[in-house]
A protein has these predicted regions:
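Conserved catalytic-core segment of NTP-binding enzymes
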Residues: 148, 169-183, 198-303
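Charged, compositionally biased N-terminal leader segments and the immediate start
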Residues: 1-27
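Electropositive phosphate-/nucleotide-binding environments in soluble metabolic enzymes
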Residues: 12, 33, 50, 54, ...
Length: 305
């Protein structure tokens, strides 16, 4: 299956929800104010967000749609153009390119978003692109997390740096970076605990890990990725706000898009925060993390069902 086919299949539920919803609303050849308001309300209910939905409504109202043409298809095209203008600047295809120098990526996210699995899939892409990879098992609060990351390291051929459950996460990160330096390994992916007892502990732990990383290399971490679960809908906006208070988020990966009609939340979060999008999780297989491509996303999200 090609990449675009994966995008289309992954966004099938979201695209069907959008196209069928628009068909129900648009029953007249002319788009009047009542129809515009219904379109805006529908987009908001589809997790596209208030700001983006309002802008899309304004664009539709300014464009004169030919009554002879299919109004739903025309509005779908307006939506596609809006997505492209918004999201092309947020592509980060360079993230996966082979690096000559040390590149440390701190990976964050709440429990259950598929963070450790995502690290494994990133590692697979890095390896396929010719990079040597280290996984740093800094979620030391759960023995299962260490075991899971070790399993992924075996699958993709990455080196794993780990310690006993309950060990200091920052010390594991330090050892991983030192090992990378000593062995000329360019890519270090650091897994972190999804959730601690309270926000202060989470903030302190993240700050400690980040500070230790910076002591080993003043330019690190080069990236701080937040993994988000698309099925959480608008809740992911709160997650981004909270994690960004702890440490500046430089990229997003959204998982579980194949199992939800809430793909519109990616538009909402892009409009509000302009954080680059690294990749999209469109399935459970090792190759189902797709490098974000705005055109493929726009095509898949607005495919007419």
């Amino acid at each position: 299956m090609g990449i675009f086919e994966k995008f289309k299949l992954g966004f099938k539920k979201s695209a069907y929800s959008i196209s069928s919803g628009l068909r129900e609303i648009i029953v007249k050849k002319e788009i009047d104010d009542e129809t515009l308001n219904k379109i805006e309300e529908f987009l908001i209910s589809s997790d596209v967000g208030i700001d983006a939905s309002s802008e899309i409504k304004s664009i539709i109202s300014q464009k004169k749609i030919d009554p002879k043409k299919n109004a739903v298809e025309e509005i779908n095209l307006i939506l596609k153009e809006y997505i492209l203008e918004l999201m092309i600047p947020l592509e980060r295809k360079d993230f996966f390119e082979k690096k000559e120098n040390l590149n440390v990526t701190l990976v964050s996210g709440v429990n259950g978003v598929g963070k450790t699995t995502t690290i494994g899939k990133i590692g697979k892409i890095f390896k396929d692109n010719g990079s040597e990879v280290i996984f740093s098992a800094c979620d030391t609060f759960r023995a299962a997390a260490i075991d899971q990351l070790e399993s992924w390291s075996d699958k993709v051929g990455a080196t794993i740096i780990k310690s006993n459950p309950g060990s200091d996460p920052a010390s594991v990160a330090y050892k991983a970076i030192e090992h990378a330096k000593n062995n000329n390994i360019s890519q270090v992916l650091i897994d972190t605990a999804g959730r601690l007892q309270n926000k202060k502990n989470l903030m302190d732990e993240f700050k400690k890990i980040a500070n230790v990383i910076k002591k080993t290399d003043e330019n690190a971490p080069q990236d701080v990725i937040l993994v988000l679960d698309a099925t959480s809908g608008q809740n992911i906006i709160n997650q981004l706000e909270e994690f960004d208070k702890i440490i500046k988020i430089t990229g997003l990966i959204m998982t579980k898009l194949d199992g939800t009609a809430k793909g519109g939340v990616l538009i909402a979060i892009s409009k509000k925060y302009k954080v680059p999008i690294i990749g999209l999780g469109l399935g459970e297989k090792i190759d189902d993390l797709q490098i974000f491509n705005a055109e493929q996303f726009a095509d898949a999200f607005t495919q007419f069902n």
